[in-house]
A protein has these predicted regions:
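A general structural signal for well-ordered alpha-helical segments in protein cores
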Residues: 1, 27, 76-77, 219-220, ...
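C-terminal helix-rich "cap/oligomerization" subdomain common to oxidoreductases
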Residues: 5, 10, 186-187, 207-208, ...
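Predominantly a Rossmann-like dinucleotide-binding segment in NAD(P)-dependent oxidoreductases
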Residues: 11-16, 21-123, 256
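Residue-level signal for the nucleotide or nucleotide-sugar donor/cofactor binding architecture
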Residues: 25, 71, 155, 214-217, ...
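Mobile, glycine-enriched helix-loop/loop "lid" segments at the mouths of ligand-binding/catalytic clefts
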Residues: 45-47, 103, 173-198
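A short glycine-threonine-serine/GTX helix/turn-capping micro-motif
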Residues: 64-71, 205-213
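Contiguous beta-strand/loop segments that form the cofactor/metal-binding neighborhood of enzyme cores
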Residues: 78-181, 216-229, 248
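C-terminal "lid/loop" region of Rossmann-like NAD(P)-dependent oxidoreductases
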Residues: 194-210
Length: 261
């Protein structure tokens, strides 16, 4: 990573890290509030969980680079690290990651074939559950949860607890549109939400999720960074920190100890 950092700095090219959690509309609003109030972030909790990936290679280390921690945990982790960067800039402080502790496992291994029918995850040599505890240099904390064992759709959020505010960023699901259906007639081509096998009963429908989840803001920021020759909001420093934390987390889980920086 340090060699890559050298290349980026020497070439003067723009490195754009596609972390949609940074650009998710509730996270962007939370960042605005944190900067305005100069909030000290004491504890954050973020999660991305679902019933497993639709990718046939998600369960293979040599195809994916890890399990649910790598596939989904990077998103809330990256979002929380970015928020910590916003806090540091607003308060004119330098805040770094001090230590990482992690536990991973394969919770679905205990299921019979019939019991497994609702869970898509098929881990071979990767984890289907992971939790990371991060301690920052100012003594504050962040907790990241990632799991392939959660039914009911995709669960994405960041909870923020500071000295002068509490902010809950609900990315998915949201309450913009709650739907109730007794049947699915006429709904064959209507998308309600992700990772739900049926549309019956009450559901929390996706409404402009490409905007709320940050995909549009991400692309707009990257294009404007090129057009106006400025740095993107999500760049190399965030990619570097996120990768460092994720790999330290795997080392922590493997060795059964806290990793200090």
């Amino acid at each position: 990573m340090d060699r890559l950092k050298e290349v980026v700095e020497k070439t003067g090219k723009k490195f754009m890290y596609a972390e949609n959690f940074v650009y998710a509309t509730p996270v962007q609003k939370a960042a605005e509030i944190i900067r305005a109030k100069k909030t000290k972030l004491l504890f954050m909790k973020g999660e991305e969980s679902l019933k497993g990936s639709s990718s046939p290679v998600a369960g293979k280390w040599n195809k994916t680079g890890g399990g649910t921690l790598m596939r989904t945990g990077t998103h809330p982790m990256g979002g929380m690290l970015w928020l910590k960067q916003q806090e540091a800039a607003a308060r004119n402080e330098e805040i770094t990651v001090q230590s990482v502790s992690c536990d991973v496992g394969c919770a679905t291994r205990c299921l019979t074939g019939d019991e497994h029918r609702h869970i898509v995850a098929q881990p071979e040599d990767v984890e289907d559950y992971g939790v990371i505890s991060v301690t920052f240099s100012d003594g504050t904390k962040a907790l990241c949860i990632a799991s392939d064992t959660v039914l009911g759709g995709t669960k994405n959020y960041i909870e923020i607890y500071g000295n002068n505010t509490a902010l809950n960023c609900n990315i998915t699901p949201t309450d913009l549109l709650n739907t109730y259906f007794l049947d699915e007639d006429g709904l064959e081509d209507v998308e309600i939400s992700e990772m739900l096998p049926a549309k019956l009963g009450w559901n929390k429908a996706f409404v402009n999720d490409e905007i709320i989840r940050g995909y549009m803001g991400e692309l707009q920021d990257f294009m404007e960074a090129v057009a106006y020759d400025r740095a993107p909001a999500s760049g190399f420093s965030l990619a570097y920190e996120t990768t460092k934390v994720i790999y330290a987390a795997y080392q922590s889980a493997e060795e059964g100890r806290r990793i200090d920086f």
